[in-house]
Amino acid sequence: MLLSKKSASFALSAFAMLFTSVALAKEAPQAHKAVELSILHINDHHSYLEPHETRINLNGQQTKVDIGGFSAVNAKLNKLRKKYKNPLVLHAGDAITGTLYFTLFGGSADAAVMNAGNFHYFTLGNHEFDAGNEGLLKLLEPLKIPVLSANVIPDKNSILYNKWKPYDIFTVDGEKIAIIGLDTVNKTVNSSSPGKDVKFYDEIATAQIMANALKQQGINKIILLSHAGSEKNIEIAQKVNDIDVIVTGDSHYLYGNDELRSLKLPVIYEYPLEFKNPNGDPVFVMEGWAYSAVVGDLGVKFSPEGIASITRKIPHVLMSSHKLQVKNAEGKWTELTGDERKKALDTLKSMKSISLDDHDAKTDMLISKYKSEKDRLAQEIVGVITGSAMPGGSANRIPNKAGSNPEGSIATRFIAETMYNELKTVDLTIQNAGGVRADILPGNVTFNDAYTFLPFGNTLYTYKMEGSLVKQVLEDAMQFALVDGSTGAFPYGAGIRYEANETPNAEGKRLVSVEVLNKQTQQWEPIDDNKRYLVGTNAYVAGGKDGYKTFGKLFNDPKYEGVDTYLPDAESFIKFMKKHPHFEAYTSSNVKFNASTDALPKK
């Protein structure tokens, strides 16, 4: 429940009074001393317990490698724990949602590997609430790690009451250090499923209230473990006094260095960023990418006055040497061998930020147990589709073309509907046909089928945009599908239907009409060029890929409030089938396309 500004202000005031008068008794001033801390951190592992593939530029060649995996995470944490003084091991939220390990085990697999990693603290992320309060409880009950979140407060009658604390205080070399937890508010309330008995409070106001109260306790060294996202936490760093270090999550940003840039990894910011708070004191902010790919390693020295300085800063990218693939002369991916392989490994071994072949035996055993069960359960039926086949795949991307289904890719409309169901507040969704790789046939649907239909691991993305821009998105996609690029760009949707001509008019436009479904009246209405709609799509086209140029222009413009929900499209498919266990197949794609008699466009 997100409170109105007036209600939130009153509630925060009451919360502040309660916190300062009861939770913390003011202490007399005391002498402080310098202390060093080793902050080791991850965030947003999203049930990625096994390694996954990425591409790097290695010695001038694009190279496929495997990165991440929780065995590597825990092995690296154990090594660094033994190596450095005063380790503090943190997880900045979003442990769950992203793979079948969550879909099938509801957080117990994630809790098991996190327990094996001996984290000191975990903060809640928005995805912790994806399965409601009951779903979060399935993660928290087996979790042996203290959970912190100051701005997420369950009512006393909630099943989540007393399951976490707003902050904790620990002692290092006789010096008290405080750590505060925060969650992202709008994303959790609007894109996840917290119960109405859970209240959410503004991130910045909560951070300042907590910092003030801890300062009154005589503590001058404060860490913020925050899933509020990089942008919000950067704002906190510059607006809130008395916080020294912010370990962030949610944005999935790789904070890196020149080593990682040389590999063409997607470094967003330097590790760590440094800002000044209103008092002029330094505040350090860092994030560790996502999907168990990075262990952040920050050495911090606090002066007696509580001023932080950095003694070490290494974002460790966890990588396997077992896969080093490049394209051969025929364009096929093949393993490097001989001198080329040795040269590649020598380059990686020379980099402080690359950690090769870390494995933890205990974690390997845990994952192996869950993997065997996952492979078995993945064949279980989640629902049944009745009626006709819903055509998809490359042969049916464009309606009414020679060789294709007259309706085009009904399967793509179906996927758009599963997104529409998941993103409960959107007005419409748009999906590219190339993202759906197969026909969806009548019969039983298993967990594995979802990942067969949607193999790219896309996440759901939203924009707030005018109707005129929605129409331009459709125009862009059709142009790319029919003329400029690939048929896979052809657009389908849910909550939206349109008619278009293959041959553009004198103004270069193909659209004849566009209608949006009014959720209140359940009536179709002409799209309003000036109205702002909340539009859902997948993160791939949201960034401008596949010819979706207008989406691409909105991507970095805050006016359009772009949000990557990090909800997996395959997970949305599974949830839809669970909600509709006997689903009658669609027979329409919601697209009327007046095709010409020209030859098929190029694939």
Swiss-Prot record:
The keyword Metal-binding applies. Substrate binds at R397, R437, F456, Y540, V541, A542, G543, G544, K545, D546. It comes from the Bacteria. Zn(2+) 2 binds at D94, N126, H227. Its cofactor is Zn(2+). Keywords: Hydrolase, Metal-binding, Nucleotide-binding, Periplasm, Signal, Zinc. Binds 2 Zn(2+) ions per subunit. One of its GO terms (biological process) is nucleotide catabolic process. One of its GO terms (cellular component) is outer membrane-bounded periplasmic space. Zn(2+) 1 binds at D44, H46, D94. Residues 1-25 form the signal peptide. It catalyses: a ribonucleoside 5'-phosphate + H2O = a ribonucleoside + phosphate. The keyword Zinc applies. It holds the Pfam family Metallophos. It is found in: Periplasm. Its EC number is 3.1.3.5. Belongs to the 5'-nucleotidase family. PANTHER family: 5'-NUCLEOTIDASE-RELATED, PROTEIN USHA. Degrades NAD into adenosine and nicotinamide riboside, the latter being subsequently internalized by a specific permease. Also endowed with NAD(P) pyrophosphatase activity. Exhibits a broad substrate specificity, recognizing either mono- or dinucleotide nicotinamides and different adenosine phosphates with a maximal activity on 5'-adenosine monophosphate. This is NAD 5'-nucleotidase.
